[in-house]
Structures are given as C-alpha cells and as structure tokens.
UniProtKB/Swiss-Prot annotation:
Modified residues (N6-acetyllysine): K188
Protein name (database record): E3 SUMO-protein ligase EGR2
Position of sequence motif HCFC1-binding-motif (HBM): 104-107
Pfam families per UniProt: DUF3446, zf-C2H2
Enzyme nomenclature, EC number: 2.3.2.-
Amino acid sequence: MINIDMTGEKRPLDLPYPSSFAPISAPRNQTFTYMGKFSIDPQYPGASCYPEGIINIVSAGILQGVTPPASTTASSSVTSASPNPLATGPLGVCTMSQTQPELDHLYSPPPPPPPYSGCTGDLYQDPSAFLSPPTTSTSSLAYQPPPSYPSPKPAMDPGLIPMIPDYPGFFPSPCQRDPHGAAGPDRKPFPCPLDSLRVPPPLTPLSTIRNFTLGGPSAGVTGPGASGGSEGPRLTGSGSAAVTTSPYNPHHLPLRPILRPRKYPNRPSKTPVHERPYPCPAEGCDRRFSRSDELTRHIRIHTGHKPFQCRICMRNFSRSDHLTTHIRTHTGEKPFACDYCGRKFARSDERKRHTKIHLRQKERKSSAPSSSASAQPSASGPGGSQAGGSLCSNSTIGGPLACTSRTRTP
C-alpha cells in the first residue's frame, strides 16, 4: 500500500488525468489535497485467468477542503469490489460509491451485470465471467462471449442390449422395434428373412389329445373282455392322402403310412389286448397302446409332427427324449460310462452296444483255456505214438523191409 500526499498552494497540479477523471477547478485561494491509494493485488485464488503484474485500482478518492487532512471533513467512502465474479459483472469493473454530489458527474456508471438466473437453481456460471480480461473503472473493453454450442444428445445406455427372443410369435421382432421413433430417410427397415426359420412348429392341438384320451377307450373297447369290434377311427383313402373322417381328429391331420415296416410286425405284446384300449387310427397299423400319451407319441410318426425344437441348431424332433440326447451333441455331455474301460457315451444304447464287445472278449478268453486243456488228454493215450501208426520190422532173411500197418478200430 502506497500513500501519496500532494499539497499545493494557489496553483493547480499538472498531472496527466484522463478526460473522464479531470479535477474540479477551484479558486486560487483554496488549498487542494490529493490523496491516492494504489495497490497491486495478487492473483485471485478462485480465478486462474487473471495474469500477474496487472495493477488493479481497488479504490480512489479525492479529498477536497481547506482544512488539513487530519480534520474530520466529508470524505468519500469507497467500497472494494468483491472477488466474486457475480458481484463485479462479466467485465470485472470495480464499483465505487461517492458521498459528494459534485463528483457524481465525473464517473460513468458501470455497465449493468447480465441477468443471472440464480433463483432457478442453475449450478453452472457463465464461462464468459472467467474468460474476460480485467479492466479498470476508467475504461471498458468490448468483449464478446464465446459462441455457445448445443449440448450433445445423451447416448443410449450400453447396458440396454436388445435381446432376440426365441419365439418371435410371442415377442415383436427386433426389426419392428424402433427405439428412436420413425427411422430416417436414409434408413430402410430390415426385412428379417430369418424370422420364418425361427418360428417353432405347431404343437399338438389340445383338443386332439383330449379326444384321443377320452374317446379312444369307448370307441375301441366296450368292456373288459371285449377284444373284437371296432378299433377306433380308421382312414379312408390310400397313400399319404388318407385322412381321418371320425370326430376324434377335428383338424383332419393326414396320417401317412410308415414307409419302413417293423422288423417284427407280428411280435406279441406282454400286455393283453383288453388292457391296451388305444389303437392306432392309421390304416395298416396294428399297434395298440395302454396309455393315451403313448398313442399321441406314436401318431406323430404318421403325421410327421415334430413339436420339440433345438434352440441351438433349430432342428425339430417328435420326441422329447430324442431332443435331450441331441442337445448333448452340442454341450458335449456324456453321462453314461462303461463299467469295464470307463469310456463315456451320450446315450445309454451306445453304452449297451459297447458293453457287448467286452462280453464277447470275455467269452473268448474263457473258452480258450478250456479248449487247450481238452486237447492234452487226447494226445497222451495208451499206445502213445504207436496208435494209428505203422509197425516196421527188418527181415532177417535180408529181404526187403516189411512194413505192416495197423489201425485202431473203434
């Protein structure tokens, strides 16, 4: 802080004042006292845009009077500007209040601050208040705030991933959903050609199963001992075009004959005929079943209905156990292990077929020692090697060798 006192008598001081800060002319017999306070403020802690070395006039006062400065005269009360940019405005102009009315016309009022919406709960201030250069109260520079850019639209949450449903019949397909409303002019909707492949096959109608369950026993068998009579609905026509005309099949599903005949067509069943009241309605098929679900599963052979679909390769199956074993080909699960070698299989019939190999090998090993043991007693019999052989003796007369053969008679 530097205090400068300048007193002069009967002559004005030749000080370079700006045009807006010119001193007031006074009579020759008055004594003027000029007092100025100049301070060099450091950089504001809250604002990093003010460069160092800038002299900021915090306050300036002109005391006028005949009495010395120590006397109590009317002086101007100066209020320092707050470092808050909201109080100083966007241009950082210091505000001063004067008590003398004759000094009001020397100072131009500072420009009004921009209307801040502090009551509306805005959390961010105008960036132009921090980017503007500091100026004094005597001069103001025209400063244009930087252009404002529209804020970008919030991006979609990356966690919201559209899921493709397993059955598009129950859920809308992803190509029909538009999260942003109507598509743009350059965007064309995807035709979704694969939707037809993902549609599951139609299931067996519940009415068909109910009719076979409730109407089969009454139509096929009338009593516990009745084995003849009508055996349920039959087909009319021939070949694959044959359809049922009975009320047990309201949807008239075509029942195709089995192209590959059974290996044992006349194989007797363990269950008596009167305990199998559900005959197959297909013409030329003599199968009968004791349970309605067995008949429903058998009818799928004639109709070709495959209601069980693999969700990995979209292959269809007529039986659920076939689908279960098929899924193991994708997952690599092999729950059936061989009891002899520990080899694992995905199907029980494969393990059963493999076990037969070990059983045949075991039979061969057990039969080999018994055959070798039975061959030894036959070789070591009475007579030894002479049995079945020829007896040769030398003649004492010097004649030729006389050989007589002797064979064993049974």
